């Protein structure tokens, strides 16, 4: 299995946490893992390594630039409430849509991530998998390739961290997308990729009723592919009932990685309180690892 890990970072966050994430992949992932770091007109020579490539996403994806230009002055498309003439409107009527601005509706902000992924999928012919990693992740010990092979089945188009509670039957919550594996050998992946880009090129993202983040559009489209094309997806989150929906470290990924989600960025670690009782054989030993024994109890 040949893997390309991709990530991106906001201006000013390279030294804060993104460099640490990239360093940890180079140190602890299989030695043939390639890394692509997407950026926005930032200095490209801040980091040199034979397995790392920097790509200016605005140069690589002109349709992203067009989308952001179309909607940059529309408060609603940027997560706020104030509507403007001929602007977009929230289609949702649920709890995420009511009464306040929210990142959940910031389509402009999260479009960057989508176009990073779609660029990588279109330009990785010699690879078997593209894996998206958020820049605030950290790989704390060596990860054998066998782990990744087992984690991402060849018959699944996507491997992701689901957060749906099957007992509620309420439409659920979209995935946690700090880690997503895209199977480049799957016969539908390029069609999926084109459809995902077209949600932004054709402004269809604004038709969604639960949110406009990258997680929202990924989940929306993957459900269509599962239903209409009988595509398999691999949910390694399995909804674990975790406070704050921090499924990342409660999945098998917690055996090797941490995700500094939200306030954890400042702390530089997740906390022991982020774990729930492990009942799966794959994850029962996570909290016995030295890294997690040293983690703060709470934040």
Residue ranges and their predicted role:
Residues 140-206, 211:
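Conserved catalytic core of nucleotide-sugar-dependent glycosyltransferases
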Residues 179-299:
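Catalytic core and acceptor-binding pocket of nucleotide-sugar-dependent glycosyltransferases
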Residues 16-19, 111-115, 212-220:
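A structural signal for well-ordered alpha-helical segments within the folded catalytic domains
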Residues 113, 133, 175-178, 214:
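Residues that flank catalytic or metal-binding motifs in active/ligand-binding sites
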Residues 95-105, 204:
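Short glycine/proline- and acidic residue-enriched helix-loop micro-motifs
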Residues 105, 109-161:
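GT-A fold catalytic core of metal-dependent nucleotide-sugar glycosyltransferases
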Residues 14, 44-47, 63-64, 139-142, ...:
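Short catalytic/ligand-binding loop motif for oxyanion handling, primarily in non-cytosolic enzymes
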